[in-house]
């Protein structure tokens, strides 16, 4: 037997109902916030992610699915959404559109070769938003508040918004120099990943998950000590907007994002619930990227966004025992007796469906009792039984499965009956 690839999953019909519910809710919220959907290819040039995500990141060095196509071009299955959206923004000259900033959202499969763990897959579904074309603390606050709104709309509680400022490029450069100076004498005691990051991306050392390295990081200088006046004021304005919006937050000066293109605002949305085992603590993350477009040969434009995993959202809902309203009414199940009635039901079904009536029938030649059980399993609102007598008299009893009451209807008027 051929099995599913490691790190992937089949989403079966009972689960796809939840997915459709979530995706519909997200679409509705994006309309409220005036964000438009964008769809980009599942694979892109490897160079896009090497430049846009960063050569020194774990994503590029360890996690990407990269291959040569038949034209000997290096292609990568997208590991994240921002770089592709920005590439599309540049390529399609969206900076020339009148409705600035451009507010976009996406939803689709991403691919990373990660260690299998709870809530993480090698193919996962990422939803994300990008607001490109406005460097304004109000936009940052809107995006952070939107992230909180999304999770609250599903009934999740125990949410904690963690924020930090990484500063502008000048502040980051000065801070990175201070980190190198701080860690260089003791870097030999750190894990191999941290050792390789010292001179390529020292801020990533702050995000190390190794316990002994975490302890050593506590004595490192903090980015807040190196923010210039511009960065300090921008961060203060973002926090003021969040206060005005009534969005609670916690500051963490060691919060950094795993990708190289972030500047100024960085944030994560977490579950702050003692019942969790820590596997799904972080639900969502993002931040501002003011140099990414130019890094990809685009115009001098700024952006901010975030991304979340649908799989981890579903896991969080399960952990908090939140049931999604995925039950949909099923209008009618047709029970048949005999070949002539069965043939008639096929045509009747077609007429009903073409008029928007959700209907089905039995195709396994079950007895009447078995067909009625199938109607129950489908949660049909109504059933009818068609046999020789019903065909001859052109009369049918429409049974309400909730009340048990029946109403006599002309068989040739059944479609109009359900269209009411």
Curated annotation (Swiss-Prot):
GO molecular function, a single term: catalytic activity, acting on a protein
Domain of life assignment: Bacteria
Keyword Transferase attributed: no
Keyword Ligase: yes
Enzyme class of the recorded protein, top EC level: ligase
EC number assigned by the record: 6.1.1.21
Catalytic activity field: tRNA(His) + L-histidine + ATP = L-histidyl-tRNA(His) + AMP + diphosphate + H(+)
Record keywords, A-Z: Aminoacyl-tRNA synthetase, ATP-binding, Cytoplasm, Ligase, Nucleotide-binding, Protein biosynthesis
Database matches in InterPro entries: aa-tRNA-synth_II, aa-tRNA-synth_II/BPL/LPL, Anticodon-bd, Anticodon-bd_dom_sf, His-tRNA-ligase, HisRS-like_core, HisRS/HisZ, HisRS_anticodon
GO annotation, cellular component aspect: cytoplasm
Pfam families: HGTP_anticodon (PF03129), tRNA-synt_His (PF13393)
Entry coiled-coil feature ranges: none
GO biological process, one term: histidyl-tRNA aminoacylation
Major location (coarse): cytoplasm
Compartments reported by the entry: Cytoplasm
Homology family: Belongs to the class-II aminoacyl-tRNA synthetase family.
Record HAMAP family: His_tRNA_synth
Subunit: Homodimer.
Protein name, per record: Histidine--tRNA ligase
Lineage: Bacteria, Bacillati, Bacillota, Bacilli, Bacillales
